[in-house]
From Swiss-Prot:
Keyword Oxidoreductase: yes
Enzyme nomenclature, EC number: 1.4.4.2
Keywords: Oxidoreductase, Pyridoxal phosphate
Top-level taxon in the UniProt lineage: Bacteria
Similarity field: Belongs to the GcvP family.
Full protein name: Glycine dehydrogenase (decarboxylating)
Reactions performed catalytically: N(6)-[(R)-lipoyl]-L-lysyl-[glycine-cleavage complex H protein] + glycine + H(+) = N(6)-[(R)-S(8)-aminomethyldihydrolipoyl]-L-lysyl-[glycine-cleavage complex H protein] + CO2
GO molecular function: glycine binding; glycine dehydrogenase (decarboxylating) activity; pyridoxal phosphate binding
Quaternary structure and interacting proteins, as annotated: The glycine cleavage system is composed of four proteins: P, T, L and H.
Length: 961
């Protein structure tokens, strides 16, 4: 019989949908039969309230094949005109070592992992992060460092907040900012200070530090215009007032310059972009945050520490986790959860690959080229603002500023205008002698009349950095920076670290509320295109036409997926999206002349919600949940009656973190709107909504969108993320602005929430690719299959572990909560025991004890097929059988596969085995493990020991052997 497929079908423009979605049609039918429903449509009807379901498909273009999407995006990228940028201001051209590019940035073993909450299967990433902390403490001269922040500007804002927290002796409400800080840093700090109620002074330290009263001050080192001030003296002045001294430092300059820690700084922040991370039109990049040990419990962000496992072997873990927002909620040090793990480890590997000598050589080359440029400009008659500098010159040019800028543009060069009458030039590791010749030609008004060898001779003879400014000895002297200088050794080291971790290239990661879905290769390819990576974030927007068009298209795509009218791409993490959304609400009410301070937050909310509300200076009022896990309407009514027109917003996650679609969501929205307040719908669970229901249509005024969840940006082992916000029309005029790039429709008074205008712009192509290849049909199918997979797991496990919450028809949303409390009471087995035992089956654990203590929250996503779901369910059922044996006395409560989990190769290779179960039961409890197994490299880690004996820098190399 002849095949009658149409030619259109043979082109298979929608084939990516079946690549992204795990179950095939045969598996779908089997899973639906297990659920006793006839079709996916019937399942959705029984799961999602009819009042919110969309009747029409999403207004998106038809899906296209992978190669077509890549061609379309390549044509957009080609519209970016990448000039040579000497703009500086915290962003510089750099070279990513190819061994790191290929084996880390382009490697799913690194970019698809999750935050290392289960350290026994994350020792590789943890070692990379410990290396990062070692690098930062070495370069800054500080006692400790955290494991990265989102960007330099938000790190500065976090340092300001920390200065207020720890400065108990100082009652001032004022903070001092060096006027030579980067403009984007000043803007973000002003925004944060406004909502904390801090007063801000921006002035020259040499003029104003001694006479002002403040609880903290930040100094830029070197300054934005390249000058190097009397940092040590200024630090002493600040500390004489019982205020904290914060230094924002350029990481490359610290290779040569005296460290801020050596000069007495309390906190040192900055950005690691120069250490092998592309500019990417603003990100993503890893910021650093270093501090004195006495402030460790007041520090934001994650800290990696050294501990021991149950066999006494050295092991790494995230230390002092009780500081984090998901535990302390509105009392947390910060709302930040995602940081920039992937970029942090890349920068550490950059330092390790080059080593102390190589990094020193790069820094000295940059400095000598800068001295040569200074000699050339002086010989042409130009006046330099500073005679002391590292890599940046500020040239006083008077009324020649515009002609020089025009001349530079003609030569495809970007310079930086420093106010009126001055230009700055920042050199980088990519600067060559030919570049110097081109720069001098711009200032000479024609071909360079200068001879490079003579300029070099002058530069070598002239010392612009006095001895008291230079570092005493080389930085990066720890052994880890002298081990891996050949590509062979670095390649093997990176592979060793990768092999110690479980990422999506090994198995499903069923973390609830995290959406660990496929990060398709086609989506990742554009991230490393030079047209995207080499663009300076403050280059004229006319040079970034491709980016601008891609932003516009992505904003329309995200608006279509959510039902909102406007999208801001600036927030570079979900936490920052929450903060930006709440500030938008505040600005809206300010414009109306209304003062509202209450934020209602359901008991089940993400811990980030109350932390974000507190940062926005809102008072958190908790709304109770009923016995079914839904918002308690009676309690909501009582809180509305009590606070009325003082309510600014409610923050509600939908579907809820309890894993159900609440039937009364529209009723909740109506009640909030009735008192003039706004509805913030947390977008963490959008993966169950896209194409099915739109928050902008069923009552939401604003939502943040976790692009690293629903829209396929990978988690990177703990970052990068992206958290743009969608708003309805009435909130659009109040979206975040930026001091250095015009964002259409915004004004400066709205404030700034991220260092870069469009956040981590270079990873936005990932979400663009995903939506373009899925189209309306695929986006809806992704949500439907996510719901199908979660319900299949719930059905298979419910006779073994109680499902805590479900909807009125007995179905869950895209995730489900297993209630382990009865088992714990009967057997003594904890949720941690089960999480560690899952490692022996090759799985990362679900989310533990959130949002309810004593539970596991499971989210399989649409990308996993029935085989993988069954593999996970079989593991959980086998674990339940082991618990039954403990309950019945067949296994001792203190010696069984759960309390001893996870088991390592050291365990099974040891000549002694004195346990109540066999080695096979320990390590190969199911048959599939005989064919392939991912081994934990350490046994269960001692958390208490690690916090009591806090070590956050690298041990000696011998300790790793």
């Amino acid at each position: 019989m002849p095949n009658t497929d149409s030619l259109n079908n043979l082109f298979a423009s929608d084939e990516f949908i079946s690549r992204h979605i795990g179950p095939d049609q045969n598996q779908v039918e089997k899973m639906l039969a297990t659920l006793e429903v006839d079709s996916l449509d019937a399942l959705i009807e029984k799961t999602v309230p009819a009042t919110i379901r969309e009747a029409q498909p999403l207004p998106l273009a038809e899906p296209v094949a992978e190669h077509t999407a890549l061609e379309e995006l390549k044509s957009l990228a080609a519209k970016n005109d990448v000039f040579t940028s000497y703009i500086g201001l915290g962003y510089h051209p750099t070279r990513v070592p190819n061994v790191i590019l290929r084996n880390v940035l382009e490697n799913p073993g690194w970019y698809t992992a999750y935050t290392p909450y289960q350290p026994e299967i994350a020792q590789g990433r943890l070692e990379g992060l410990l290396n990062f902390q070692q690098m930062i403490t070495d370069l800054t001269g500080m006692e400790m460092a955290n494991a990265s922040m989102l960007d330099e500007a938000t790190a500065a804002a976090e340092a300001m907040a920390m200065a207020k927290r720890v400065g108990r002796k100082n009652s001032s409400n004022c903070f001092f900012i060096d006027k030579n800080c980067y403009p984007q840093t000043i803007a973000v700090m002003r925004t944060r200070a406004e909502h904390f109620g801090f007063d801000i002074i921006v002035d020259a330290p040499e003029k104003a530090l001694a006479g002002e009263d403040y609880f903290g001050a930040i100094l830029q080192y070197p300054g934005a215009d390249g000058g190097i001030g009397d940092i040590e003296s200024w630090i002493k002045t600040i500390q004489s007032k019982d205020a904290l001294a914060i230094v924002a430092a350029d990481i490359m300059s610290l290779v040569l310059l005296r460290s801020p820690g050596d000069m007495g700084a309390d906190i040192v922040i900055g950005c690691n972009q120069r250490f092998g991370i592309p500019m990417g039109f603003g990100g993503p990049h890893a910021a650093f945050f270093a501090f004195k040990e006495k402030h460790k419990r007041s520090t934001p962000g994650r800290i990696i520490g050294v501990s021991v496992d149950s066999r006494g072997k050295q092991a790494l873990r995230m230390a002092m986790q009780t500081r984090e927002q998901h535990i302390r909620r509105e009392k947390a040090n910060s709302n930040i959860c995602t940081s920039q793990v992937l970029l942090a480890v890349m920068s550490a590997f950059y330092a390790m690959y080059h080593g102390a000598e190589g990094v020193d050589r790069i820094a000295r080359r940059i400095h000598i080229l800068t001295k040569m440029l200074s000699e050339g400009l002086i010989s042409l008659g130009y006046k330099l603002r500073h005679t002391t500098f590292f890599d940046t010159l500020c040239i006083e040019v008077g009324d020649q500023q515009k002609p020089l800028l025009d001349r530079a543009q003609h030569a495809r060069i970007n310079l930086c205008a420093m106010g009126s009458g001055a230009l700055s030039i920042s050199l980088s590791e990519c600067t060559t002698l030919d570049d110097l010749t081109a720069l001098i030609a711009v200032f000479a008004g024609g071909e360079s009349p200068l001879d490079m060898p003579s300029l070099e001779a002058k530069a070598q003879q002239k010392a612009v950095l006095s001895e008291n400014l230079l570092r005493d000895g080389r930085a990066l002297q720890h052994e880890i920076f002298s081990q891996y200088h050949s590509e062979t050794e670095m390649l093997r080291y990176l592979k060793r670290l990768e092999s110690r971790d479980i990422a999506l290239n090994h198995a499903m990661i069923p973390l609830g509320s995290c959406t660990m879905k496929l990060n398709a290769t086609a989506e990742m390819i554009p991230v490393t295109w030079p047209e995207f990576g080499n663009m300076h974030p403050f280059a004229p927007i006319s040079q970034a036409a491709g980016y601008a068009e891609m932003f516009n298209q992505l904003q329309h795509m995200l608006a279509a997926c959510t039902g909102y009218d406007a999208i801001s791409l600036q927030p570079n993490a979900g936490s920052q999206g929450e903060y930006a959304g709440l500030l938008t609400i505040k600005k809206y009410f300010e414009a109306k002349g209304e003062v509202r301070s209450i934020c209602l937050i359901p008991q089940s909310a993400h811990g980030t919600n109350p932390a974000s509300a507190q940062m926005a200076s809102m008072k958190v009022v908790v709304v109770n949940c009923d016995d079914d896990g839904n918002v308690d309407i009676a309690d909501l009514d009582a809180k509305i009656a009590q606070h009325g027109e003082n309510i600014a917003a409610i923050m509600v996650t939908y579907p809820s973190t309890h894993g159900v679609f609440e039937e009364n969501i529209t009723q909740i929205c109506d009640k909030i709107h009735a008192v003039g307040a706004q509805v913030y719908i947390d977008g963490a669970n959008m993966n169950a909504l896209v194409g099915i229901a739109s928050p902008g249509h069923f009552g939401g005024d604003v939502s943040h969108l976790n692009l690293h969840k629903t829209f396929c940006i990978p988690h990177g082992g703990g970052g990068p993320g992206m958290g743009p916000i969608g708003v309805k029309d009435h909130l659009a005029p109040y979206l975040a602005a930026h001091p250095l790039q015009e964002i259409p429709g915004t004004v400066a008074a709205n404030g700034t929430v991220s260092a870069a205008p469009w956040g981590s712009a270079s990873i936005l192509p990932i979400s663009w690719m995903y939506i373009r290849m899925m189209g309306a049909k695929g986006m809806k199918m992704a949500s439907e299959y996510a719901i199908l997979n979660a319900n299949y797991i719930a059905k298979r496990l419910k006779n073994h572990f109680p499902i805590l919450y479900s909807g009125k028809h007995g179905f869950v949303a895209h995730e489900c909560l297993l209630d382990l409390r009865p088992l714990k009471e009967a057997s003594g087995v904890s949720e941690e025991d089960i999480a560690k035992r899952l490692m022996d089956f090759g799985f990362h654990a679900p989310t533990m004890s959130f949002p309810v203590a004593g539970t596991l929250m499971i989210e399989p996503t649409e990308s996993e097929n029935q085989f993988e779901l069954d593999r996970f369910c079989d593991a959980m059922i086998q674990i339940r059988e082991e618990i039954r044996k403990i309950e019945q006395g067949e296994l001792p409560a203190d010696d069984n596969p759960l309390v001893n989990a996870p088991h390592t190769l050291d365990d099974v290779c040891n000549s002694e085995w004195n346990r109540s179960y066999t080695r096979d039961q320990a390590c190969r409890p199911l048959d599939y493990l005989k064919h392939h197994k991912v081994w934990p490299t350490v046994n269960r880690i001692d958390n208490v020991y690690g916090d009591r004996n806090l070590i956050c820098s690298c041990p000696g190399v011998d300790d790793y052997r």
